[in-house]
Amino acid sequence: MPIFKYLWGMIKLLLPALILGLISCRTGRPLNYQVEPNGKVKAETTTMSFLEQLLREDSLLRPMLDKKDEYKIQVIYTRIDRNAANEPTFSDFFFNVNPAHYFYPASTVKMPAAIMALEKAASLKEQGINKETTMITGSATPGQTSVYNDPLTPDGRPNLASYIRKIFLVSDNDAFNRVYEFLGQSYLNGGLRAKGYPETEIIHRLQISLPEEENRRTNPIRFLDRQGKLLLDQPLAYNEAPYFQRRDSLGNGFMRGNTLVPQSMDFSHKNRIGLQSLHNILRAVIFPMAVKPEQRFQLSEADRLWLVKTMGEFPTESRFPPYPGQDTAGNKILFYGDGKSGPVTPGLRIFNKTGGAYGFLLDVAYFADLTNNTEFMLSAVIYCNSDGVLNDDKYDYHTIGYPFMRELGRKIYDYERSRKREHAPDLSEFRFNW
């Protein structure tokens, strides 16, 4: 019977959000909702007309917006205004956002995982552990692999800091997997749900295909000091909690090897997190005092600023790990598209995490123009799979996805540059020495 009690508890938690999503579908009006600690959903209806009208001014965006459901487009734009004391207030605008509509989050799940890893490391401070402590990943099952060194760190020692930098600089899948293994499913998902993101289900590694049972198991890990002394021996972990009973499917066919299976592909046991959750997780890092205490990540200010700096760094600016051959802005798709569209805009920093897989392209971003004192948040997802077939490596990223993202980011940026503010923001806290 415990499993039924658990499932009933999750149904009661998620049902209000699903009802609000259905209302949003029927009315065409977006809903800004927040799940409170007691499980109640507080909703505020906001107007979609402003954001949609603004985006429809753009001749490149308009035809895509006309097919918003075909492209599964969702957009969240947050206007930020400061008072005389430089304290921010936020106005959220939504286009076609519905928490009940599934999209594959791809590499955007790496952002909350990286943040939770920093939080977990901070909780181990009394044991002498921090983000730069040597982290040796072992293996205890046939599906697990070990890590004893990292040639991309200055001293060859693997550590969380290096993994997190790889995640934000080049979206390294193995780096995410090592963070996932450090956290374990229970800590990762339980921590995010406790902070107000109840639909979150990050339940598998990336790039490598493993059975569900193997993804429930996470590797044993040892932390060592500079002299090789053992600080912590974290054993293999196994998540026994049942997964959500989901019915998420996509496409009208998928490839299994060289064979086309003419039916939708089941995503019920793949990662899930909503766009608004990703948007609010980023806000909690950039503006921790703007969210409720229970929604904040328990990071030292030094770790938080280090994380923000890492999010805003271009791959070519990195010394460790070095990425000399990367496109300068290839990790900033909401303004630069595929990163091949020319030089970067001086003074503009974008603190973000991108993702792309199964035809979905995503970016979750905070923009700070340090030259023109302009800031805003923008998150978006688009589905680029015109033939509806998954796993065929024939996606429309370069013809639909990247152009849409680039144009969307520039449209909002141009609007923000021209928008009059009562108080210009002081963005000096984002002037890092990259």
Where are these regions (language model features)?
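Short glycine/serine- and small hydrophobic-enriched flexible loop segments
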Residues: I115-S123, L169, N173, N280-F287, ...
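Active-site-adjacent helix/loop patches that line small-molecule binding or acyl-intermediate pockets
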Residues: G39-D58, E70, S139-A140, Q144, ...
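Active-site SXXK
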Residues: F103-I129, M135, L378
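Bacterial Sec-dependent N-terminal signal peptides
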Residues: M1-N38
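Beta-lactamase-like hydrolase cores
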Residues: P30-H101
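Structured C-terminal helix/loop/strand segments within mature extracytoplasmic catalytic/sensor domains
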Residues: R26-S59, T259-W434
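Acidic helix-start/capping segments at beta-turn-to-alpha-helix junctions
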Residues: I76-D81, G128-N149, L183-G184, R205-E213, ...
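Extracytoplasmic
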Residues: E70-K72, F90-D92, N98-A100, Y104-V109, ...
